[in-house]
Amino acid sequence: MIDRMAEMGITLDVSHLSDQAFYEAFELSPLPHIATHSNFRAVCDHDRNLTDNMAKMIAARGGVIGLNLCPRFLSEDGYADTDDILRHVDHGLSLVGDRALAFGFDIDGTDGEYPMGIDATRSIHDQVIELLLSKYPVSTVERIAGENVIEFLKGNLIS
């Protein structure tokens, strides 16, 4: 089925794939893929997070990795804070650069739990932008906060 999807120009969201399925998908489809809500296993060893090799494969094909705010995917003890968010961003930037990262918060899967320092009564998008602006250049934050996803969609989903 994946090879047929590739023939039709359909890209994949690899966020919920097992490691084996991830590599098989990349073998069967030459298209860029997106991990809409995944973090980095090197920072938090959870099987839903991407290995460094997976992240590099996504970036090498022009794909995008959406950073997830679920505490259990940010920190191995499940109690995350804004420093954990920054650790994943730092790792992603050093590994794949700022053109392969995006927001992919997956807040509907958090059961109402957010990283400490994130106020659920305010715009989460705006709060994370503020957090990133405290550490990274505006151009990097703009890419992560939306430009990268827009470019991916223009190049792969919108005809």
Predicted segments with their positions:
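Short acidic/histidine-rich active-site segments
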Residues: 69, 96-118
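Histidine/acidic residue-rich metal-binding segments in metalloenzymes
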Residues: 1-34, 47-62, 83-99, 126
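Conserved, mostly hydrophobic/aromatic
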Residues: 12, 37, 65, 106, ...
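Active-site beta-loop-alpha junctions enriched in small/polar residues
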Residues: 10, 15-19, 38-41, 70-72, ...
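Mid-to-C-terminal alpha-helical segments outside catalytic/metal-binding sites
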Residues: 119-159
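Outer-membrane beta-barrel pore domains
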Residues: 76-82, 111-119, 132-135, 143
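Acidic-and-aromatic substrate-binding clefts and catalytic sites of carbohydrate-active enzymes
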Residues: 41-49, 75-80
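A conserved active-site cap/scaffold subdomain adjacent to cofactor or substrate pockets
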Residues: 59, 64-74, 79
